[in-house]
């Protein structure tokens, strides 16, 4: 960035990356691309300044087999909070032999699966702690909602396809295959799983599946959305010339607003972009996130990039 021919457009991965580069970042507040975001949740801010804009997003939550849920006597409308989820999961467990399926697929702690819990699930108590404290990063995570984290994980492992003593050896493939085989109603994972579940040779159609928020009993659960975020933020070098800055802003806006740009982002690059003119995705989980956001529900931001280290997670 200190070179004479430094780039005008660059990328950071989130608050931690921004901390290293924010002195170079142009304030994007009031720009056309900022106005085209579907939610300010996808902007990276430092105080009142918008220093980064997420340009590709993914969502994760509880992938839900609606068909099995209905066989158990419930619909997705019955699950609007942690208490609701707990009631449904424990009732399914109580009738597991009769129903022929479990509430949750295995929460395996093998390395192919544990990231779902020590990173993605752990994001929720951190997010709500940051919300309560009015911050988006910290030098010391307090653990305000660790009990809630324990409660949701206990719900997973005590209402699962397997005994908790078996989880150490369970893999990500095990969990997915249990879900594919109609052995569980809920499967914590993300929008990237869509092609593993729906399509040629797969057992599900779009009508069978949806994604629910991961409720942990904190915050405004009635208005909670999916965990939707990114580790890919566009930033503009404020040290560049005015002409280069303006040309870069025009290019960014073209990418997310024009027919040619949005089709290139969606079809050529496979991106889901958080902008008003985005090409419609066929992914049922992406559609669920879009519907929740349009209904005014707040996406849970990805704060796991602020976790101190892998050792801290372990």
Where in this protein do the model-derived segments appear?
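Conserved N-terminal structural module of periplasmic/extracytoplasmic solute-binding proteins
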Residues: 1-17, 30-33, 168, 218-221, ...
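Short, solvent-exposed loop/beta-turn-alpha elements that line the ligand-binding surface or hinge
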Residues: 27-40, 104, 108-111, 126-151, ...
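Glycine-centered hinge/linker elements that transmit conformational signals in sensory
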Residues: 89-90, 135-169
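Extracytoplasmic/periplasmic solute-binding protein
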Residues: 51-55, 60, 86-138, 184
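A structural signal for short loop-to-beta-strand junctions that line the ligand-binding cleft
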Residues: 7-8, 34-69, 100-102, 220-227, ...
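Extracytoplasmic/periplasmic substrate-recognition and gating elements
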Residues: 72, 161, 201-267
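C-terminal capping/gating helix-and-loop segments adjacent to ligand/active sites or protein-protein/ligand interfaces
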Residues: 228, 270-277, 287-314
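Hinge/lid segment of periplasmic solute-binding proteins
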Residues: 12-61, 116, 120-122, 208-212
